[in-house]
Amino acid sequence: MQKPLTLFCLPCAGASATMYIRWRRLLPSWITVEPIELPGRGGRMDEFPAESYAALTQSLCDELVPSLPERYVLFGHSMGALLAYGVAQGLYARRSSMPIALLVSGCAAPSRQDSQRYNNMQSDAALIADLSRQGGTPEEVFDNQELLRMTLDLLRVDYRVCGSFEYAQLPPLAIPIHSFGGRADEISAARLNDWRLESTQTFTLDWFDGGHFFLRQSEDWFMYVLKKRLMDSRIEVFSATLTSA
């Protein structure tokens, strides 16, 4: 019988962790999908959203540490990937139980982040243009002024979080990093490849048809590859255990 594995999932900018709920029926039962909701959205709508990358990642570590499972993986898409990296580094600094892998989707490596890009997109017009370009927002959001206002306000705050990120050359993580990219996304292969610099272990980069939201546009294939990477991570942990025994 497969030993259980918890998959913690962090959302992209302007979104709720509910974007991952459907994964619970798309992935096998040995994978427990645990979406991590951020303040100011979804079930935490009544909380003030964080506006600092450092404060948000520290808060996420505070929430996770008391109940970390035996085997878990951190996954994030876009902003969520950058947060997942910060959480992994924060857990390492606290000498907490580490994830068996870090999975980063649709996000340039920490050393290749363009913080100024986010700082330049604070007006409604700039945010709407960015949403339209990325293609992940339903048309009904653009057609409903109330929904659009909520989305823009949240996206603006999330972009401030991304804009506050400052890269520091911390020790590479001693866990595998698996990166995922869209062939039609604006993020170049070089910026995705540099995730390899953040790990002393296995690094992979998988490509999918689609733009920034390739994980929806190529969902079936993405789910297949995601499951494979999770299985690979379990095997690496098992092999390491045998070697050290």
Language model features: what each stretch is:
Residues M1-A245:
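Non-catalytic, mobile gating and regulatory segments of ester bond hydrolases
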